[in-house]
Amino acid sequence: MSNEAKCPFHQAAGNGTSNRDWWPNQLDLSILHRHSSLSDPMGKDFNYAQAFEKLDLAAVKRDLHALMTTSQDWWPADFGHYGGLFIRMAWHSAGTYRTADGRGGAGEGQQRFAPLNSWPDNANLDKARRLLWPIKQKYGRAISWADLLILTGNVALESMGFKTFGFAGGRADTWEPEDVYWGSEKIWLELSGGPNSRYSGDRQLENPLAAVQMGLIYVNPEGPDGNPDPVAAARDIRDTFARMAMNDEETVALIAGGHTFGKTHGAGPASNVGAEPEAAGIEAQGLGWKSAYRTGKGADAITSGLEVTWTTTPTQWSHNFFENLFGYEWELTKSPAGAHQWVAKGADAVIPDAFDPSKKHRPTMLTTDLSLRFDPAYEKISRRFHENPEQFADAFARAWFKLTHRDMGPRARYLGPEVPAEVLLWQDPIPAVDHPLIDAADAAELKAKVLASGLTVSQLVSTAWAAASTFRGSDKRGGANGARIRLAPQKDWEANQPEQLAAVLETLEAIRTAFNGAQRGGKQVSLADLIVLAGCAGVEQAAKNAGHAVTVPFAPGRADASQEQTDVESMAVLEPVADGFRNYLKGKYRVPAEVLLVDKAQLLTLSAPEMTVLLGGLRVLGANVGQSRHGVFTAREQALTNDFFVNLLDMGTEWKPTAADADVFEGRDRATGALKWTGTRVDLVFGSHSQLRALAEVYGSADAQEKFVRDFVAVWNKVMNLDRFDLA
């Protein structure tokens, strides 16, 4: 008998057929339980912000400057300088960000993990991170990988003569991959038009995706699906970069600025390249893409398959990209690897070789580079940058800072001595609090006035929820701070019930004005604080209605943003298309409503128990959009009871879909057939899904009322303060 057959661990945990294999459509709650303390080696007492603030950032930068020109034989530096490689590393770390759900980006150092560490577009960035390991090892916990990747990109630019806009630390590492939807394709770089294509109709890209192919960060540099058409490529570029929060000017600046440096690599056929890191053998120690082409490195390196050096100054900031773009006519050719690229017609060989100082090459460009000349809007910007180098430098500096900091959230999270003083609109700025805050006695007085104003528990709770639940843990945007719910576009969102919202805000503003006018010594309450405080008052009243005396925690300190401080277009991506906590769907979607609920809960950083108790509480408090009765399983509305769970789990009720809408259900008395309740998929999933039913049973038990109230108050307080980074 073989040793393998004798192994007592043949059925080791995790090796068998999984639930997902048996039931691929089962609702997956695992995304709610990522990044727990169990996967974090730092320990519960470690505070990364405090560690970073003690870091000698200047010393780190000196070490990075030295690294740039210390070429290693195992992966030699192009032109004797690693700047181009490290710019690409930082760019690709940040460039996964997409505006639709705020996921991706540099904020967690996810480039270290699958799938990103093995995406074709990230080929050989494993070497860049290995080059950085001695510096990461030296400074240890004081600088995260997430911060180091971006800082290295900045230093790369600075070491080649470019003045950056600034750098902010504060990106704490995570220790496992994010579960992010990157597309449905089953093949790397699969072209559009297949059964799993991300495109439909007239090349309409699926939301929330931004990249054009599975395994790419942005667009295909050879053109759409490899078609070398610069004008068609411009359409892809505009769509993709817009989905990554960049306008046309920022897009041109980033492409031209980034392609001022370094080169691409396509010395030979891609068939020579080995497996990516996650598929490589254990002896490779996490490195991938081992090439059998000649030496496999340096002048023989194969990465994208393209062989392009854009400028005569690949290790120095210049304006040569635009000089070449407009100074030559271009003809289509192929790289040694067979990839479509462009070469300057009749040009002299003026481009330096990366490793042989005696060799020169003709200027070359990518299809997507030529888009900056042949798309009319891009050309106009490009010519202006060509004629005004200082505008180009400023635009690139600002766009690079935005690219590398877009997912960090508000400036309150920025750390370090290089944080720029200028406040930028895309940071969703909120004024600093410049007055004394209310105390506990003031809060009690204000709550009493709110409850005496005629506003209902439902109105108070739903308004506070609408303000706070815009928060996204992905890119740290949204939340109640700033009171942007009173501004465009939030005040007009369908989910926020504009007519009711306007009436509630008018009442709260009158209470606020009267209170502030009666104060001495400058004490004030902001509308942002009052919206949250009013919601807390509503929860307390609802608990009282259910026979429980509770005090909901409240921390003042929010401020009110102005319309001028609010980018309406940028803010629009926060509009909920689905909010299961309010039983709201803006339209009909292919994705089931319960999946959208879990997605929303994950963006709110909720666990499955938190999601469960929160939804059950909001139902009985009447927080549904449009005062819908779906899921309001109680006769004691606006009382904080566990009735949602009690009645959902009642075996005396039989559920069937309605004839009019298969996603809406009627609950009828099993004996009489009398209609008792109506509910949606989001409601019924707490009785049908085995894990969620187990949680519902906890809160539906006879002894659960007190625990239900306590747990609801805790998670309510959590959501109200998700954007209060000043309290951390």
Curated annotation (Swiss-Prot):
<keyword id="KW-0349">Heme</keyword>
<dbReference type="GO" id="GO:0005829">
    <property type="term" value="C:cytosol"/>
</dbReference>
<feature type="binding site" description="axial binding residue">
    <location>
        <position position="259"/>
    </location>
    <ligand>
        <name>heme b</name>
    </ligand>
</feature>
<dbReference type="GO" id="GO:0046872">
    <property type="term" value="F:metal ion binding"/>
</dbReference>
<dbReference type="InterPro" id="IPR019793">
    <property type="entry name" value="Peroxidases_heam-ligand_BS"/>
</dbReference>
<dbReference type="GO" id="GO:0070301">
    <property type="term" value="P:cellular response to hydrogen peroxide"/>
</dbReference>
<comment type="similarity">
    <text>Belongs to the peroxidase family. Peroxidase/catalase subfamily.</text>
</comment>
<dbReference type="InterPro" id="IPR019794">
    <property type="entry name" value="Peroxidases_AS"/>
</dbReference>
<feature type="site" description="Transition state stabilizer">
    <location>
        <position position="88"/>
    </location>
</feature>
<dbReference type="InterPro" id="IPR000763">
    <property type="entry name" value="Catalase_peroxidase"/>
</dbReference>
<dbReference type="GO" id="GO:0042744">
    <property type="term" value="P:hydrogen peroxide catabolic process"/>
</dbReference>
<dbReference type="GO" id="GO:0020037">
    <property type="term" value="F:heme binding"/>
</dbReference>
<comment type="subunit">
    <text>Homodimer or homotetramer.</text>
</comment>
<keyword id="KW-0479">Metal-binding</keyword>
<dbReference type="GO" id="GO:0004096">
    <property type="term" value="F:catalase activity"/>
</dbReference>
<dbReference type="Pfam" id="PF00141">
    <property type="entry name" value="peroxidase"/>
</dbReference>
<dbReference type="InterPro" id="IPR010255">
    <property type="entry name" value="Haem_peroxidase_sf"/>
</dbReference>
<feature type="cross-link" description="Tryptophyl-tyrosyl-methioninium (Tyr-Met) (with W-91)">
    <location>
        <begin position="218"/>
        <end position="244"/>
    </location>
</feature>
<protein>
    <recommendedName>
        <fullName>Catalase-peroxidase</fullName>
        <ecNumber>1.11.1.21</ecNumber>
    </recommendedName>
</protein>
<keyword id="KW-0575">Peroxidase</keyword>
<comment type="function">
    <text>Bifunctional enzyme with both catalase and broad-spectrum peroxidase activity.</text>
</comment>
<feature type="cross-link" description="Tryptophyl-tyrosyl-methioninium (Trp-Tyr) (with M-244)">
    <location>
        <begin position="91"/>
        <end position="218"/>
    </location>
</feature>
<keyword id="KW-0408">Iron</keyword>
<keyword id="KW-0560">Oxidoreductase</keyword>
<keyword id="KW-0376">Hydrogen peroxide</keyword>
<dbReference type="InterPro" id="IPR002016">
    <property type="entry name" value="Haem_peroxidase"/>
</dbReference>
<feature type="active site" description="Proton acceptor">
    <location>
        <position position="92"/>
    </location>
</feature>
